[in-house]
A protein has these predicted regions:
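Residues forming the flavin
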Residues: 1-212
């Protein structure tokens, strides 16, 4: 039930399909609240949290699926199975940045974001090569991509002007309940005036505290 899965449920409905529901393995949706409201609730599409597909049925083509609830270890719970007669199953399995060009250039990748490891100017491990947007890490909104591209352009300008130094380096690490943090490197002798961090939490937290 990430944003793409939610949006596709609405799109299928608008195109005339009868959507039986959206299943999410986790006990919460990974999509934006507005997409849950506008894509599912407004169209009466059920959201099955803590559920996964355990069986598919059909001869020559898909005819049905079985959903089951999962426990805290994400294992199906016997006796919770639900069967649906369907002819289409869409799988929304997340996004991974396309980085074949970065690999070809020998850029160091961050295993947490599946994209390049960058500093506060969005420069990669190869001097003069910068990364931003969904080629760096997956963004929820295009507005964030545009803003990050602006910061990367400013960093590129600093590099071309020769005011960027890379002598002193520290690494930013994701702590408890944080999946990743970008940028992953800070060159402390050449920081921009403002350093913005992007991160994703591992699960929804209400009333949480951010510690740097």
């Amino acid at each position: 039930s990430g944003d793409i899965g939610l949006i596709m449920a609405r799109r299928m409905t608008l195109e005339g399909a009868k959507v039986s529901g959206v299943a999410e393995l986790m006990p919460y949706s990974n999509g934006l609240p507005r997409n849950i409201k506008q894509c599912l609730e407004d169209f009466g599409i059920p959201l099955f949290l803590s559920h996964t597909v355990t069986k598919i049925f059909g001869h020559d083509r898909l005819e049905g699926i079985e959903l089951a609830q999962v426990d805290e270890n994400r294992r199906p719970i016997a006796g919770t199975e639900k069967n649906f007669a369907v002819d289409t199953l869409l799988l929304s399995c997340g996004l991974i940045p396309e980085n074949h060009l970065g690999d070809a250039c020998g850029i160091v990748m961050d295993p947490h974001i599946k994209g390049p490891l960058v500093d506060a100017d969005y420069m990669t491990s190869v001097p003069g090569i910068f990364a931003c947007g969904n080629g760096l890490h997956v963004h929820d909104l295009a507005d964030f991509v545009v803003h990050q591209a602006t910061l990367a352009a400013q960093g590129c300008t600093r590099y071309l002007q020769g005011v960027k130094s890379m002598q002193k380096e520290i690494h930013a690490q994701a702590g408890q309940n944080v999946g990743y943090v970008v940028p992953g490197i800070l060159h402390t002798d050449s920081l921009p005036k403002i350093v913005e961090f992007y991160f994703r939490v591992r699960k929804p937290i209400r009333g949480g505290t951010i510690i740097l």
